[in-house]
Amino acid sequence: MKGVRAAFLAALLCAGGCVAQPSDPSSPPIERAGISVGSIERARAQLVDIEKRSGGRLGVALIDPAGAVLLSHRGEERFAMCSTFKTLLAGMVLSGVNGLEPEDRLIIDPAAVEGHAPFTRSRFEEGWMTVGDAAKNIVTVSDNGAANLLLDEVGGPRGLTEWIRALGDDVTRLDRRELALNENAAGDPRDTTSPLAFGETYRRVLSDDTVLDAADRDQLARWLVASETGLNRLRAGIPGDWRVGDKTGYCAAPGAVEINDVAIFDPAGGGWYTLVFFLDRPREAGAFADALGAEVGAIAADLVRSAS
């Protein structure tokens, strides 16, 4: 779990900007990673159409295993993360920050548990859970109670944000815990990211051996593949014979709903593509928004398949 973490932090804590953020592709499009200009133009037009039909604001980023931005829509605009931050929190825990080990115990206070927390509630009788089980369940079932317990262990939202800064991401920020982080107030930068920044940070955590060692990267990927919350969103548009995982997010505040999903997929064993889908204030949530996510997944898959 510890691996190269000390060297990683020493190398990256150099003004927080050592790793360049991917830029938002601008018009006119250029060929990217063997994908034709025409294919990119068609994909962009499809995203514009999806946004119009949604009645809300759509953020998308598709990044290849090497970090090339293949597609984006509102890629540098801020969106609430909702529960998608939990993948980064799990990655931070796997890095062994603050000496955390998977078998360490976290004490549960039932009175402090809010919202969706199926695993935490299943542990009320025992009164504790392990760090490893908490990290697994914040990804696979998006457990809020486990997320808050882990935040307590890593220095709170500020601690996670500082870890993200050390990855070279100066955009993504977590300011509050569950459930407050889901407020999604208009113009409020708290608990937000951009599709491009988030996609690149996701990619690094899942692919860069200076962040996590191979065993921990594989563990995090397996949790994402096992996730149960996003089967009808991005995954529904990605071919079933590709390896795919995802982490969803849902901000449910009245008048400020956001439907999110961040997927990783590997068509042929060549590494993880990262696909970010943020849908802010759509006219409907539920199956309607999920179906739009599936369309975005299909657009991304078609684009990757079109590469020469």
PLM regions and their residue ranges:
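C-terminal motif of bacterial Sec signal peptides marking the signal peptidase cleavage site
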Residues: 15-17
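Structured C-terminal helix/loop/strand segments within mature extracytoplasmic catalytic/sensor domains
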Residues: 19-50, 66, 70, 153, ...
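Short, conserved catalytic-motif segment at the N-terminal edge
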Residues: 56-78
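Mid-domain, small-residue-enriched loop/turn segments at the edges of structured enzyme/sensor domains
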Residues: 57-58, 135, 148-207
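Acidic helix-start/capping segments at beta-turn-to-alpha-helix junctions
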Residues: 65, 103-121, 154-155, 181, ...
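Active-site SXXK
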Residues: 68, 80-108, 138, 275
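Short, well-structured active-site flanking segments
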Residues: 95-113, 157, 161, 213-216
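Conserved catalytic neighborhood of penicillin-recognizing serine enzymes
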Residues: 113-150, 157
